[in-house]
Amino acid sequence: MFDSNHEQELSKRRTFAIISHPDAGKTTITEKMLFFGKVIRVPGTIKGRGSGKYAKSDWMNIEKERGISITTSVMQFTYKNILMNLLDTPGHQDFSEDTYRILTAVDCCLVVIDAAKGIEERTRKLMDVARIHNTPIITFINKLDRDSRDPIEILDEIEKELKLHCIPISWPISCGKNFQGVYHIYDKIIHLYKSKFRKNFLTLDSFLDGSLNEYLGADLSIHIRQELELIMNVYSKFNKEKFLKGITTPIFFGSALGNFGIDHLLDSLIKWAPSPLYRQSNKRIIKPQERKFTGFIFKIQANMDLKHRDRIAFMRIVSGQYTKGMKLTHVRIKKNIIISDAFSFLAGERISINKAYPGDVIGLHNHGTIKIGDTFTQGEEIKFIGIPSFAPEIFRLIYLKNPLKQKQLKKGLVQLSEEGTVQVFRPILNNDLILGAIGILQFDVVIERLRIEYNIDAVYKKVNIVLARWINCGNHHSLYNLKKSYSSYLAYDISNSLIYLAPSSANLNIVMSQNSDISFNATREQ
């Protein structure tokens, strides 16, 4: 049954992801947001090997051991009567394409930047993916309570490298040991950091009338006034329309570890981030206000609960409403199913739900029939597009210590590849199994999970592959010639799509120049 308050439920939802480079403070920010949302009483920022304390969003065994976030966690909490759907992506240096794909399921991104380091490699790559969809970006420059680079220098770097126009919303008052707080340019309030006075903020009057010297000292007061005058003349004012188009990014400063500035971020997400947006299908645009249910699978996680050896499919709801016991069409396999046991998430914990709306992420039990990119509807035969696979960057040949377990190995690799942990390739000339990943740590994850979840001991050999490109060719004669001339470089992925595995960029360039009517693609639509 369709609720009459559907529009109201849409307006109450924000679905966003947090992305960053390793050690920028993303996990701490996630924990503090859950704290503000009253999901946890004390942020669990301490985590490490043998400590027994781990971040709420880190629930896989290898994550707890290493103190990093490998999988994408989905968390739901309420802040000021707004339902926040937070998709927490891995922040460590080596993550999987699952990290990239998660950005297709959100309506906004929060980018976290270390004030001492500025923009780093993984942030650049994630931003490239976010910009494919012109996703609105809010930026938080973290760790101002430590030695930092000049804020204007960081903003210049953001504008140059990320191609975003910066709009400072808050501005830091000094940094490191002298960090005093931030000035909120639009609220016209100075928020004090760990103030020794009985005040947490100062109004604009205090800022103007000279009494600020009492709190900051004469020299710092003069400096911050001059700096603010400069940035308010140089940078444009916030324009929500340009933000929603992915042209500008509002900038906030703070210290996640010091629990300073996180409430400003949450307030901005409520105020500026879009409520659930439309999605493009292969036939038409699907709007969240529509009565009929639609949703797509953007992630599959195997064995979240080792006791049950289950597989969970993560679905982003696009339109309509989920109600317990409803009948849906699994479009790819043309099968109707009854969904009576969907649930929401808090890291490793599941909460059974009776109802969910566009923007929400729900979990479905998967017995091997659901794949990434699958669409579920109430009968309409559509497929959501823009949920790609990304070409891996690192490759390994995997083989068994016990050759008799080849069947179990293939089963385990199929499941791990379907959830986006790694990609599996079968060369057309032999029976080897080649794995491809975005980051090197994913290979460790595969070995660990094969051992724990499938009782398989496997090892790797290096393989002479540096690039992979999917083949797209409508000319059968050209495709035949490619297979005949370059068969030793060709393989099939898990969906039987042909892919070229190049030993060098020079090799790939030569093959591409000799086969101009064949497309060599770095992404493949699911």
Curated annotation (Swiss-Prot):
Cytoplasm among keywords: yes
Annotated keywords: Cytoplasm, GTP-binding, Nucleotide-binding, Protein biosynthesis
Top-rank taxon, per record: Bacteria
Domain tr-type G per the UniProt entry, residue ranges: 11-277
The keyword Ligase appears for this protein: no
Signal peptide positions (record): none
InterPro entries, sorted: EF-G-like_DII (IPR053905), EFG_III/V (IPR035647), G_TR_CS (IPR031157), P-loop_NTPase (IPR027417), PrfC (IPR004548), RF3_C (IPR032090), RF3_dom_3_sf (IPR038467), RF3_GTP-bd (IPR041732)
Location of this chain's protein in the cell: Cytoplasm
Annotated positions binding GTP: 20-27, 88-92, 142-145
GO cellular component: cytosol
Gene Ontology molecular function: any one: guanosine tetraphosphate binding
Main localization of the protein described in the UniProt heading: cytoplasm
Pfam families xrefs: EF-G_D2 (PF22042), GTP_EFTU (PF00009), RF3_C (PF16658)
GO biological process: regulation of translational termination
Family label: Belongs to the TRAFAC class translation factor GTPase superfamily. Classic translation factor GTPase family. PrfC subfamily.
UniProt xrefs under NCBIfam families: prfC (TIGR00503), PRK00741.1 (NF001964), small_GTP (TIGR00231)
Physiological role: Increases the formation of ribosomal termination complexes and stimulates activities of RF-1 and RF-2. It binds guanine nucleotides and has strong preference for UGA stop codons. It may interact directly with the ribosome. The stimulation of RF-1 and RF-2 is significantly reduced by GTP and GDP, but not by GMP.
UniProt-recorded name of the protein: Peptide chain release factor 3
